[in-house]
């Protein structure tokens, strides 16, 4: 009996064991199904609400301590109190930002004006990020600082009341957790929300701990979820007691967070509790750096079929579209030059006149909600029509709408996601040199480049929703001289030329820096021919 046995013999000899295995498996599925339901009151939902209530009180208490520190006028103690506030906020962030987005804006909004272009209404900066900038101002306005702190504290004290009459389900809780993983990877570890305090690693640890506590309730004792526990634990270990400047973000992403995101997505799908309220994200993708993580068809414009893409490629290179038969789209957006012309500013229709701005790459341009440097076009189709009709550019005699749609389909397809960085993230160890790995960590960390050039497209598409294209006021110079008498700001007003709001003066769209080695010179006016001064 204890000798070599075939599979059929084992089945025959152990009917009782088969029954036990079946019952255990059934009970395990029953337990998980009781924890997760598409709707209704479940242990997962109750735990999330209880956690929110408890941590909201903790956050409110930290806001009160922040207020006392600010009133005392000790800047260093106030900064430390703000770090404590920010960390405690991370305990409620996933739930608050998901269920109460408008209420959340008072706490952690970017310290800039936000405008609704239709009616040109705008919201003034407010919240912890603005408080941070004030605490690092050499000459802060104490009255304004105290007003900001008081506004945050007053709102925080009322947080538990938000739960009144809230109806949530497990699908929503799990989606809020999914979004929080993206927030950790794309915002927290880069320093986007606290660039001066540099508390992003500590904040990430709190956010991940909150995620793990909620996750454990859903996993229970299910052994099939051991991989999730493994990657979550590894992510926590990598974050623990690490400084912001020295943190290895590539290892954190590649070895822990991206696999965790993948396994978490599988878990949600396998248990039939998928909910996707995102405008752009593809939850069927493996992870944030998968080529299909963002869906081009979810951005402005139409769907791109193969036939349309092929026709669009032909038209893109066809000089007959121009009024004089001398220029094509490829004249300024040459595929061999990263879909640019590598000139400071492009040459116009007549072959002599210089245009006003640099020709940006068309690679990954599908992943934007605004086209042109000033964002005056809301789709690739609108951009293409504008260029074809412009007397300084293509000066076309007539334009067929079918041609516009075809060219847009081709341009929309230009997102290869096959750079050495992409291959390294996909665990091709030899794809990046040691120097490049160091550079990527600096880019996403100490240098804070990724606070404007957000992962995974490395452009101004803002995480975690990826539903807004960001514009920045950098004070771009007219040349590459950054000091002395040759230092002059660019006269180009950027987005202000479209929307006459003072905070749009000098604002330009943040372009992708993918394949940037092929696309010099840089900035809207091509003022920088090399990376070093930039």
What are these regions (language model features)?
Residues 283-386, 424-533:
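Short glycine/threonine-rich turn/loop motifs
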Residues 53, 57, 72, 76, ...:
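Soluble non-cytosolic domains of exported or imported proteins
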Residues 39-291:
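Mature extracytoplasmic or organellar-lumen-exposed domains after removal of signal/transit peptides
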Residues 1-3, 492:
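Short regulatory "switch" loops immediately downstream of catalytic or recognition motifs
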Residues 106-167, 171, 314-322, 327-328, ...:
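Extracytoplasmic redox metalloprotein regions
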Residues 22-41, 234-308, 368, 373, ...:
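Post-cleavage N-terminal segment of exported redox proteins
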Residues 4-7, 13, 20, 24-27:
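Short, low-complexity, charge-dense intrinsically disordered segments
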């Amino acid at each position: 009996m204890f000798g070599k046995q075939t599979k059929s013999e084992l089945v025959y000899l152990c009917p009782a064991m088969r029954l036990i295995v079946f019952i255990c498996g059934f009970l395990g599925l029953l337990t998980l199904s009781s924890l997760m339901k598409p709707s209704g009151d479940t242990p997962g939902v109750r735990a999330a609400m209880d956690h929110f209530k408890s941590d909201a009180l903790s956050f409110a208490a930290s806001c009160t301590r922040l207020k006392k520190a600010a009133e005392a006028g000790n800047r260093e103690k106030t900064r430390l109190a703000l770090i404590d506030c920010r960390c405690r906020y991370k305990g409620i962030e996933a739930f608050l930002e998901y269920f109460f987005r408008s209420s959340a804006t008072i706490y952690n909004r970017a310290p800039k004006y936000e405008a609704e272009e239709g009616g040109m209404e705008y919201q003034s900066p407010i919240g912890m990020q603005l408080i941070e900038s004030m605490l690092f101002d050499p000459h802060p306005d104490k009255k304004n600082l105290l007003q900001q702190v008081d506004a945050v504290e007053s709102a925080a004290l009322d947080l538990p009341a938000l739960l009144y009459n809230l109806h949530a389900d497990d699908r929503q809780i799990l989606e809020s957790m999914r979004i929080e993983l993206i927030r950790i990877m794309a915002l927290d570890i880069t320093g986007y929300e606290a660039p001066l305090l540099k508390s992003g690693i500590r904040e990430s640890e709190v956010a991940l701990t909150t995620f793990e506590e909620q996750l454990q309730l859903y996993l229970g004792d299910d052994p099939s979820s051991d991989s999730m526990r493994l990657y979550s634990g590894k992510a926590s270990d990598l974050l623990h007691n690490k400084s912001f400047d020295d943190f290895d973000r590539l290892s954190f992403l590649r070895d822990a967070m991206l696999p965790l995101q993948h396994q978490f997505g599988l878990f949600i799908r396998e248990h039939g509790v998928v909910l996707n309220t995102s405008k752009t994200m593809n939850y069927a993708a493996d992870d944030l750096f998968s080529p299909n993580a963002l869906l081009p068809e979810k951005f402005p414009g139409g769907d791109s079929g193969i036939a349309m893409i092929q026709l669009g490629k032909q038209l893109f290179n066809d000089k007959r579209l121009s009024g004089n038969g001398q220029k094509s789209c490829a004249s300024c957006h040459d595929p061999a030059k990263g879909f640019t012309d590598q000139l400071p500013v492009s040459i116009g229709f007549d072959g002599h006149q210089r245009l006003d701005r640099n020709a940006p790459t068309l690679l990954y341009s599908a992943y934007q909600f605004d086209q042109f440097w000033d964002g005056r076009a809301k789709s690739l189709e609108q951009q293409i029509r504008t260029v074809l009709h412009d007397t300084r550019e293509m000066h076309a005699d007539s334009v067929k709408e079918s041609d516009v749609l075809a060219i847009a389909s081709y341009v929309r397809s230009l997102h290869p996601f096959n750079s050495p960085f992409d291959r390294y993230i996909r665990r091709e160890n030899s794809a990046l040199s040691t120097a490049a790995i160091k550079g990527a960590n600096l880019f996403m960390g100490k240098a804070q480049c990724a606070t404007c050039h957000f992962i995974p497209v490395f452009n101004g598409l803002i995480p975690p929703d990826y539903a807004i294209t960001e514009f920045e006021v950098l004070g771009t110079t007219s040349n590459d001289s950054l000091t002395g008498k040759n230092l002059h700001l660019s006269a180009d007003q950027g987005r202000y030329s479209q929307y006459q709001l003072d905070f749009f003066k000098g604002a330009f769209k943040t372009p992708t820096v993918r394949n940037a080695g092929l696309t010099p010179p840089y900035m809207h006016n091509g003022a920088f021919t090399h990376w070093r001064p930039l």
